[in-house]
């Protein structure tokens, strides 16, 4: 396992796929990083030389990934909640923030159903 940005990336997979194990790096970013470094996308991690690994590390260090990115996202959500914006209120209540209907669905965001007692006869 190679260690990049504090994450052990799998050795047996292609470099493009392995880089996506790092939080904040998706397919597109992984391809851009490899293009900047000059490494083929088809190479397996175990076949990388130390120089290539160091170059990839240096390129990824320029990006905001892992802990820094998670912290920034959490601070953005906290800021929205503090200023009392609509999105912040939706975050606080645990509801969808992007305009989806909540009458029937939104179970992922709302959690399991809370059963309400029926009317007694």
From Swiss-Prot:
Stretches of the chain forming a coiled coil according to its record: none
PANTHER family reported in the protein's UniProt record: 30S RIBOSOMAL PROTEIN S13/40S RIBOSOMAL PROTEIN S18, SMALL RIBOSOMAL SUBUNIT PROTEIN US13M
Bias (Basic residues) ranges: 106-121
Organism this protein belongs to: Enterococcus faecalis (strain ATCC 700802 / V583)
Keywords tagged on the record: Ribonucleoprotein, Ribosomal protein, RNA-binding, rRNA-binding, tRNA-binding
Function: Located at the top of the head of the 30S subunit, it contacts several helices of the 16S rRNA. In the 70S ribosome it contacts the 23S rRNA (bridge B1a) and protein L5 of the 50S subunit (bridge B1b), connecting the 2 subunits; these bridges are implicated in subunit movement. Contacts the tRNAs in the A and P-sites.
Family the entry assigns: Belongs to the universal ribosomal protein uS13 family.
Taxonomic classification: Bacteria, Bacillati, Bacillota, Bacilli, Lactobacillales
Official protein name in the record: Small ribosomal subunit protein uS13
Pfam families: Ribosomal_S13
